[in-house]
Amino acid sequence: MDATSIITQVSRDDEQLNVYPSYPNDKDAWLGFSGSVWLPDCPADHAQLTHDVDRLKPQKRGLFHSLLCCWRRNRTKTNQNGTQIDGSTTPPPLPDQQRYLLPQVRLTDMHRKCMVIDLDETLVHSSFKPIPNADFIVPVEIDGTVHQVYVLKRPHVDEFLQKMGELYECVLFTASLAKYADPVADLLDKWNVFRARLFRESCVYYRGNYIKDLNRLGRDLQKIVIVDNSPASYIFHPDNAVPVKSWFDDVTDCELRELIPLFEKLSKVDSVYSVLCNSNQPLNNQTNQQQHPQELQQAPNQLHQQLQQQQQQQTISATTVITQATTLSAPTMLNQQQTSPPSPQSELLQKT
């Protein structure tokens, strides 16, 4: 087993990463499965907030790591709900007692929005290669061998988490394995900000990616915001996302600190869709947020078909005009030249 497969990361030019297996039911990939914005114009009353959001651009992402899900500790603060995903477009229906990934909202969070926060390349960067200035060194046992994972904290992550914990019901949601991500979260979360921790088992495997399906959280979609460096993670719910730049080791990075004013304002609006919209409408139709994921993939195909039809119609029209022009008799063309100034096209015909 490749040790790096326990961490889900995006790639950069100088790093070689593994990719997901071609088939999610591969026994080597699923053995031990434990279960558990591009942001255009928004309403005028959110003009300043929209200005803060517009600078955020989704980053181009590489392929994710290969999977190997292993056991993890049974923690009361870690949510254990979930089910194995067979690679279809949507997760299978869950029994009533396992319907949602998150527990009931605490009284202290009753009037707060839910913030889903990614881990790798959003809050930290981890490597199996020794890093002299690592903030944490986490031992991880893989196939009977203990490996050291070197973890760097993103600049201003402490300030960011502390402030978000005061404003939101915060949930850690990562596509990495719990045996790595859980101890990292223990060291990172000094203030017990994360009300729950969700790992790779809670994701939906769809078209080679692990998707964080916000429908399964058990919270009002209009009151959920996801902070993630990978657009593939929130492909089902792009209107709920605030994309962040992938971070590896830049000590001058200020992304998290600069996002704090945005999230302070976002915590006060009635619906996140009024700001994090991907259309000119202030609030998208709720059914668009809950539509079958396959329809999200079909929409570009329908647009492509419409463009092809338009091109075919233009070709037919152009052919008709050319045919009509060639059927004109010579006297008719001479009469037209006498009654009207010669056109560039007629001059070219005369020269030929």
UniProtKB/Swiss-Prot annotation:
<dbReference type="InterPro" id="IPR004274">
    <property type="entry name" value="FCP1_dom"/>
</dbReference>
<dbReference type="InterPro" id="IPR050365">
    <property type="entry name" value="TIM50"/>
</dbReference>
<dbReference type="InterPro" id="IPR040078">
    <property type="entry name" value="RNA_Pol_CTD_Phosphatase"/>
</dbReference>
<feature type="region of interest" description="Disordered">
    <location>
        <begin position="284"/>
        <end position="310"/>
    </location>
</feature>
<dbReference type="Pfam" id="PF03031">
    <property type="entry name" value="NIF"/>
</dbReference>
<keyword id="KW-0472">Membrane</keyword>
<feature type="region of interest" description="Mediates substrate recognition">
    <location>
        <begin position="103"/>
        <end position="267"/>
    </location>
</feature>
<dbReference type="GO" id="GO:0040019">
    <property type="term" value="P:positive regulation of embryonic development"/>
</dbReference>
<dbReference type="GO" id="GO:0004721">
    <property type="term" value="F:phosphoprotein phosphatase activity"/>
</dbReference>
<dbReference type="GO" id="GO:0008420">
    <property type="term" value="F:RNA polymerase II CTD heptapeptide repeat phosphatase activity"/>
</dbReference>
<feature type="domain" description="FCP1 homology">
    <location>
        <begin position="108"/>
        <end position="266"/>
    </location>
</feature>
<dbReference type="InterPro" id="IPR036412">
    <property type="entry name" value="HAD-like_sf"/>
</dbReference>
<keyword id="KW-1003">Cell membrane</keyword>
<protein>
    <recommendedName>
        <fullName>Phosphatase Herzog</fullName>
        <ecNumber>3.1.3.16</ecNumber>
    </recommendedName>
</protein>
<comment type="function">
    <text>Prion-like membrane-associated phosphatase. Phosphatase activity depends on amyloid-like assembly at the membrane. Might have a role in establishment of segment polarity in embryos.</text>
</comment>
<dbReference type="InterPro" id="IPR023214">
    <property type="entry name" value="HAD_sf"/>
</dbReference>
<feature type="region of interest" description="Disordered">
    <location>
        <begin position="332"/>
        <end position="352"/>
    </location>
</feature>
<dbReference type="GO" id="GO:0005886">
    <property type="term" value="C:plasma membrane"/>
</dbReference>
<dbReference type="InterPro" id="IPR011948">
    <property type="entry name" value="Dullard_phosphatase"/>
</dbReference>
<feature type="region of interest" description="Prion-like domain necessary for both protein assembly and membrane targeting">
    <location>
        <begin position="1"/>
        <end position="102"/>
    </location>
</feature>
<keyword id="KW-0378">Hydrolase</keyword>
<comment type="subunit">
    <text>Monomer. Forms higher-order protein aggregates with amyloid-like features during gastrulation. Interacts with babo, dah, Irk1, pch2, Ras64B, sax and Src64B.</text>
</comment>
